[in-house]
Amino acid sequence: MTDIHAQKILILDFGSQYTQLIARRVRELGVYSEIHPYDCGDDFITEFAPQGIILSGGPESVTGTGTPRAPASVFTLGVPVLGICYGMQTMAAQLGGKVEAVEHREFGYAQVRAHGHSQLLNGIEDHTTPEGHGLLDVWMSHGDQVVGLPPGFKLIASTESAPIAGMADEERRFYALQFHPEVTHTRQGKRILERFVRKLCQCEARWTTGNIVEDAITRVRNRIGAERVVLGLSGGVDSSVVAALLQHAIGEQLTCVFVDTGLLRLNEGDQVMATFAEHMGVRVIRVNAEERFLQALQGIADPEDKRKIIGRLFVEIFDEEAAKIEDARWLAQGTIYPDVIESAGSKTGKAHVIKSHHNVGGLPETMKLQLVEPLRELFKDEVRQIGLELGLPYEMVYRHPFPGPGLGVRILGEVRKEYADLLRRADAIFIEELYRHDLYDKVSQAFAVFLPVKSVGVMGDGRRYDYVVALRAVETIDFMTARWAHLPYDFLDLVSRRIINEIPGISRVTYDISGKPPATIEWE
């Protein structure tokens, strides 16, 4: 079996919003990468034994006091190093170069001229000048710049406003770029990263979907042995892929618990049972807990309170069911790599909590189960590819995100069965028409929201005084920022008419045209 972790790239995070993007780009090249804090220490780096190191960008200024620096071992380990933006600046400062703050931050598109036929950039270009020099279309985002090269370095790139936009010490294999090769705005960014990872670091393409699945199955079997595993199955992408993976790895040793909260999408419970219990032969215990959830949410209007109640009750019910499974020794969870990174990052205490996380909180300590997280090394796009490899339906694997509390946070204010039933039907019509008009995969997330207010309407000769729903559709790459989807007016008109005509109790449909920021994607 191929050792998919034998060759790896270490990414030291200096706080850039693009750090995860660097890791994903490296993995897309078939090479395993991990993100760790810039101050992880020399011992850790030596033990990690990377084939190469990438220093990320970051929001700080190298010219300030007490700002982040790379551990000394980065430059003594003898492996190739690539500094990006802040990573370039700290490399320059630490190795004897000079960095200064610029009067005007450079942010956005720029054109870079390549110099000196460096191993990193040679032959990579978007255009050429009349004199034959290569030009690159790139993305810049910096407030400092290198104004003096460190000893041993040569100039490899420049722009009109940044005379030193790239530098290299070819002998020590240290390279640095002021621009961001990881973002799509830098058109040749993938080729630059490929040159660094595959040629300069000499990594082979071992990180492939087939190899990842084979590795995960082997590791699960070695760790679990003949013991039983319990998994909370929600119907979401992550838990569904874990279920499929464990079914392939350990078969009948897996039992899934599917808690039907009464806050799921239309027919979702039946779809989950059909896919896993009937089609894949997974042992699934379905718990109809609608009454318990609705009772617990009675009179509760605050979104955070609703989240906590739903999370606590889910854990309670899951705990009850898991206790009934004889000889269960392991709890499987759909933790993915961004969860691991965010959890590590939150320990710094610098992040502000906008909303408590959708995923269910920790299980009670009384539950004496060991944890198995087969997806904890994987990004979401990798999880989806594995789902397809394991035979899950495309529609399930590429389904839009759905919050852990379900419709509980898409019904504004108090949750009632009547509201949930109306919302389920409106949401189903919206999604059905998105599929029918080939728009579902063109938006990143789409759903309906129930507004607990009544609006007057007219049906035939009579007046109606019924509820309002809002439709929400957004386009985004990372869900950190999003723009509202400009769906065709004729399409919105059709969806609105269907909802109002087919669902007694709804008299008005609105469309949410708020971006993120300032709004969040979910309403609560």
Curated annotation (Swiss-Prot):
It catalyses: XMP + L-glutamine + ATP + H2O = GMP + L-glutamate + AMP + diphosphate + 2 H(+). One of its GO terms (cellular component) is cytosol. Its EC number is 6.3.5.2. Keywords: ATP-binding, Glutamine amidotransferase, GMP biosynthesis, Ligase, Nucleotide-binding, Purine biosynthesis. Pfam families: GATase, GMP_synt_C, NAD_synthase. Residues 8-206 form the Glutamine amidotransferase type-1 domain. Pathway: Purine metabolism; GMP biosynthesis; GMP from XMP (L-Gln route): step 1/1. CDD domains: GATase1_GMP_Synthase, GMP_synthase_C. The active site is at C85 (nucleophile), H180, E182. It is an enzyme of class 6 (ligase). GO terms for molecular function: ATP binding; GMP synthase activity. Homodimer. Catalyzes the synthesis of GMP from XMP. This is GMP synthase [glutamine-hydrolyzing]. It comes from Methylococcus capsulatus (strain ATCC 33009 / NCIMB 11132 / Bath).
